[in-house]
Swiss-Prot record:
GO aspect biological process, one term: fatty acid metabolic process
Highest rank taxon of the organism: Bacteria
Protein name: Olefin beta-lactone synthetase
Subunit text: Monomer. Forms a complex with OleB and OleD.
Any Pfam family the entry gives: AMP-binding
Function: Involved in olefin biosynthesis. Catalyzes the conversion of 2-alkyl-3-hydroxyalkanoic acids to beta-lactones in the presence of ATP.
Family according to the record: Belongs to the ATP-dependent AMP-binding enzyme family.
GO annotation, cellular component aspect: cytoplasm
Matches recorded under InterPro entries: AMP-binding_CS, AMP-dep_synth/lig_dom, ANL_N_sf, ATP-dep_AMP-bd_enzyme, OlefBLtnSyn
Location relative to the cell: Cytoplasm
Length: 556
């Protein structure tokens, strides 16, 4: 029975943990860096077995409830990747509480806004996070305080005390229903202040099924998830997570020797990394002999990185680049061999192929419109080959942002189905099209399109044309002026080691490249930039809004 007396069907991402603990009690669920060996590499001597993860998260769930953090309570979690992070997350799911996750590396003013918007009743964090909460007045609504580590002047209890208080309480699992709120996950904020995406339990369960089926993930595998929240899926899939020795907020600066050491020592069979991290491994150039499945998401993966990573993997391994967003993941996916085959088209201005839609998602392309669309009856669906906004409806499609009504109206469309039911369609905020083979192509963010007097230009149909120059690391198309009359400007970041004095020659070559394609022939302004701003989560999404402001300030 649910809290209101109605019968409910249990739906909870933690529901599979007790079964896995019975089936494979001694299998390592989480392996963390821990101390250092004589060679300076992490010892990875801090582990949790499935039995330990299940039993200890039971105790913590019971203890949290005793301290007022139970069903429906929103709890900010600011804990570094560690055994405590995973114990807490599964304990909160078991308790029916609602963890709130925000990227700690975002602008501090934006971070405060996110935490205040979430209106949490509890704040769980390491001492540094608790100190910042006190000094910066984060989350003033939080009255239940749990410190992971030593507790000082800020009150509350320690996680160790919580676990002791819940010890012996037995199995814990709230009878959450599919539509109950499971978590609030904030977006990366690459297009503004991060938004809190409301995840219901059915969204998490749906993601597990889509990931298992799309990528054939089998229990017993060993995963190296370089984005910690993704590691939460591993215990539900029966995998071992090896938490890498790196700063997850700065994947572009990860030490490839440390990553390779972990993958070799523990026989890592699965790897997830942002395009920035994949470039680190690609440039390191050491084979990855045990990896059978590599995935990369967060931004389009440059074709040269795809080719290099594929060369480091075994011949029968697969390198997938899923397409999606915090609001809906995965939407589509493409394997490296297919991506390689579309490289020529991408570098000629076709956009980036993101592959076939992951079933049972339904993806449709609609006419570009910057206004809110309340009802699906008000949209115009485009035919194959026409560029428009990408929309998706499916089991992982979230339906609202927390305390962001305007953002919800702009991103969600209500659709009445033929059977009389209603569903939510998510507007991805991306533009793209379907080709004749039913593959989805990504052309860039809707807000990043440049509206010139002769028509729109889309970033992913422009930048790859210029990125082929050997002295160019990456480019970014921005618009200067009023939409409809914007001047397209190409910002250029040179490869490391290329002198600024070489830019005049590079610019001449880029002009010739642009002139060879009708849609880029009108780009007449090229600006060298020392280093593009990128998102904090994946270090891969270019901050084009900031670049556009910068470009407008440069002398003609």
């Amino acid at each position: 029975m649910g809290d209101n007396g109605r019968m409910t069907t249990l739906c909870n991402i933690a529901a599979s943990l007790p079964r896995l603990a019975r089936e494979r009690p001694d299998q390592i669920a989480i392996r963390c860096p821990g101390g250092r060996g004589a060679n300076g590499m992490a010892a990875y001597d801090v582990t949790l077995s499935y039995a330990e993860l299940d039993a200890r998260s039971d105790a913590i769930a019971a203890g949290l409830a005793l301290h007022g953090i139970g069903r429906g309570v929103r709890a900010v979690v600011m804990v570094r990747p560690s055994p405590e992070f995973f114990l807490l997350m599964f304990a909160l799911f078991k308790a029916g509480a609602v963890p709130v996750l925000v990227d700690p590396g975002i602008d501090k003013r934006a971070l405060k806004q996110c935490l205040d918007e979430a209106q949490p009743q509890a704040f769980i964090g390491i001492p540094l996070a608790q100190l910042a909460r006190r000094l910066l007045r984060w989350a003033p609504s939080a009255t239940q305080i749990v410190t992971v580590g030593g507790r000082y002047c800020w009150g509350g209890v320690t996680l160790a005390r919580v676990e002791r208080d819940g010890a012996g309480a037995g199995s814990q699992l709230a009878d959450t229903a599919a539509d109950d709120v499971a978590a609030i996950l904030f977006t990366s904020g690459s297009t503004g202040v991060p938004k809190g995406v409301v995840y219901r339990h059915r969204h998490f369960v749906g993601q597990i099924e889509l990931l298992r089926n799309a990528f054939d993930m089998q229990p017993g595998g060993v995963d190296l998830p370089t984005f910690p929240p993704f590691a939460l899926f591993d215990p539900a899939l029966g995998l071992t997570s090896v938490i890498p020795d790196m700063d997850p907020t700065r994947p572009a600066t990860a030490d490839p020797r440390k990553l390779h050491d972990a993958m070799t020592r523990f026989g890592v069979t699965q790897l997830f990394g942002s395009p920035a991290l994949m470039r680190v491994l690609a440039d390191y150039g050491q084979p990855l002999p045990n990896v059978r499945l590599a995935t990369s998401a967060g931004a389009p993966v440059p074709p040269d990185v795809v080719a290099k990573i594929r060369a480091l993997l075994p011949a029968d391994a697969q390198f997938w680049t899923p397409y999606g967003a915090t609001e809906c993941l995965p939407v589509a996916a493409i394997e490296g061999r297919t991506l390689d085959a579309t490289r020529t088209a991408t570098e000629a201005g076709a956009g980036t192929c993101v592959g076939q839609v992951v079933a049972p998602n339904e993806v449709r392309i609609i006419a570009i419109d910057d206004a809110a669309i309340p009802e699906w009856s008000g949209v115009r669906v485009l035919a194959a080959g026409e560029v428009g906004e990408i929309t998706v409806a499916g089991p992982t499609t979230t339906d609202t942002y927390f305390n962001r009504d305007a953002a919800t109206r702009n991103a969600k469309i209500r659709e009445r189905c033929s059977d009389g039911s209603e569903r939510v369609v998510h507007r991805m905020g991306d533009v793209g099209y379907f080709d004749a083979e039913g593959r989805l192509w990504f052309c860039g963010r809707k807000t990043h399109r440049v509206e010139t007097a002769t028509g729109p230009l889309y970033t992913e149909q422009v930048e790859p044309i210029f990125n082929v120059h050997p002295q160019v690391r990456r480019t970014a198309l921005v618009g200067v002026g009023t939409p409809g009359q914007q001047q397209p400007v190409l910002c250029v970041e040179l490869q490391p080691g290329v002198a600024a004095s070489a830019f005049a020659e590079v610019e001449t070559a880029l002009r010739a490249v642009g002139a060879a394609h009708p849609h880029t022939a009108g780009i007449a302004r090229f600006l060298r930039h020392s280093g593009f701003p990128v998102d904090i989560r994946h270090n891969a999404k270019i901050g084009r809004e900031k670049l556009a402001i910068w470009a407008a300030q440069q002398r003609v």
